[in-house]
Amino acid sequence: MLLDIIAGQSSALYKRLLEKGLINTSFSYEYFTGFCYSAVLFGGESSDPKAVEEEIKKEIASLKANGIDRKIFSRTQKKLYGRMIMGLNDIDEIANNMVLSYFDGEDIFTDFEVYKTITPEYLEELLKNSMENEYSVLSVILPIE
């Protein structure tokens, strides 16, 4: 949810990066975790990856300083909850979620309950304790010439 607020297609950052021509619609984000680690990844095509990195850092710093707009939080929470409900229309997605839930020791509907309990204050605290510039890295893949 936090990443969607920061860089989702309806976010101020996404709009700003598109308007400046720094990204195209391939821009994305993901969060992954494993035993004793977690990471956030922003990716996509850009002619100026350093400028994109700076804009992302600026947006994160702004959210840390000013907090999360409550209307944006509410809209994002409803959007993601709705996306989860829509996933129940896809038998493949249901099967995948059942397997993932089983291995996590949860049932398939746990995420629905978790989404209801997330608050803006929780996300603000999470943001303050993560995404530090000192732990970030920019990796650029250039075409072979």
Please annotate each region the language model reported.
Residues 1-12, 16, 41:
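His/Glu-based metal-binding/catalytic segments typifying zinc-dependent metallopeptidases
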Residues 22-24, 37-39, 133-136:
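Active-site lining segments that contact anionic ligands and/or coordinate catalytic metals
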Residues 8-9, 29-87:
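M16/insulysin-pitrilysin zinc metalloprotease superfamily fold
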Residues 43, 77-145:
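C-terminal regions of mature proteins
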Residues 17-20, 31-33:
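Aromatic-anchored, glycine/proline-accented short structural segments
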Residues 20-28, 121-124:
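Short amphipathic beta-strand starts and helix->beta connectors
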